[in-house]
Amino acid sequence: MSKKLGLAVASALLAAASSANAGITIPAGDWTLDIGGVVNAYYTHTSFSGDTGAGTGPLGLGDGNADSTANITTGLLPNYLSVSGKTRQNDLDVGFTISINPGVSTTASGFQGAQQENRQAFLTFGDKSWGSIKLGKDLGIYASDAILNDMTLLGVGSGAGSLAGNTTTLGRIGTGFMYADWKSQVAYSSPNWNGFSFTVGLTQAWDASTSVNTPKNPNAFSAHRGGSQTAYEGKASYEWAGDVAGKVWVSAITQKFDNISDATSVSGTSDDRATAWDLGATVNVAGFGLTGYYGKGDGIGQTVQFNDGFDLNGKSRDSDQWYVQGTYTIPGAGTKLGVSYGESTLDGNSAADAFKDIQDSMWVIGAYHPITKHLNLVAEYSNTERDVNNRAAPDAKAKAKTISLGAILFF
């Protein structure tokens, strides 16, 4: 059996899990097929508190009410069934990956909902001497290392309170980093030169979007995506092993928006460009792990890319994200204990927005215990908060406190 999991997030899962994972390897003529996956489910209990009103509803915060809710749901990772294949032909390493990603949450009798994503469908070809090319759909390039180093990748994080019926929760998405998301792309990845590597790619341009998550102000949006241009993404990293092991990385994205519409749906208000960059580092020594991350953007928005990134006049908003995380793996038992804190802030524009800034933050304490080499028990406590700092109206605040208990299985 192979020691790797045939998923885009495999490196993070292998690093985060304290046990070995194995796929199911099948020789098939010139090909070697690898079948792997993840199954997880969690009981969650969320208590809400804070102010009611516009802008306090996202991130599983209810609406600032004093209610509580219990759910049984998938965590940050959806369930996965992934089939990968690889072969060597004409001096090229050729491969593919296709995955299906169902959730476990149900919220109504006689209605199962979509509960299905298809996050991966890509092919690769290349050689270790010059790198590889990927065509298809996979995890985005910008901000990918932020989520792959998040300890809640094995758990729940935020969003359990109001995302029941969804395929996944949010983890630390929106409370420390932007979502890398799953994107159609053409990407080149370099060879690994003694720990250094990079990836650059063209990814499908998306529209600027608007939501009810931004209080008291509508937002501009677009319907023509990037026009004649794709989005451009890239990242570079350096990784080392030894008694003190670690990794440092940097990534960026830029995309043009064609014919942005203002809040009255008048098209062609402006053309603009969103840009964002991030950097991070993680270090592991003697069972201790420390991760630090910071990102900044203009027009990138909040939580998911390009959401609420432009005000009602079509002017881009600034935003930044950061988180710190510490973990310790108990010798012998293999139990990983962790604590992390992070913030995401969207700045209002003085000419258009009634708010100065919107700050989403979260504390997480987690324990991740391997009871077999493939099965982990997970316990988490998270405290998620949204602070809306207004220019004239009273400020608003909402909280959600969530306890999560469950298990995640790798095969």
Spans of features found by a protein language model:
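Detector for outer-membrane/organellar transmembrane beta-barrel domains
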Residues: G227-I365
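Outer-membrane beta-barrel architecture
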Residues: S82-S84, F122-F125, A187-S189, K235-S237, ...
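Gram-negative bacterial Sec-dependent N-terminal signal peptides
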Residues: M1-G23
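Gram-negative outer-membrane beta-barrel proteins
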Residues: Y43-D51, P102-A108, I141-D145, W206-T210, ...
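Outer-membrane beta-barrel "beta-signal"
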Residues: A398-F411
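Outer membrane beta-barrel
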Residues: I24-T46, S68-A208, S228-T230, Y238-W240
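Repeated loop/turn-to-beta-strand initiation elements of outer-membrane beta-barrel proteins
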Residues: D91-V94, S129-I133, G195-F198, G242-V250, ...
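Transmembrane beta-barrel strands of outer-membrane/channel proteins
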Residues: G37-H45, F96-I100, K137, V200-Q204, ...
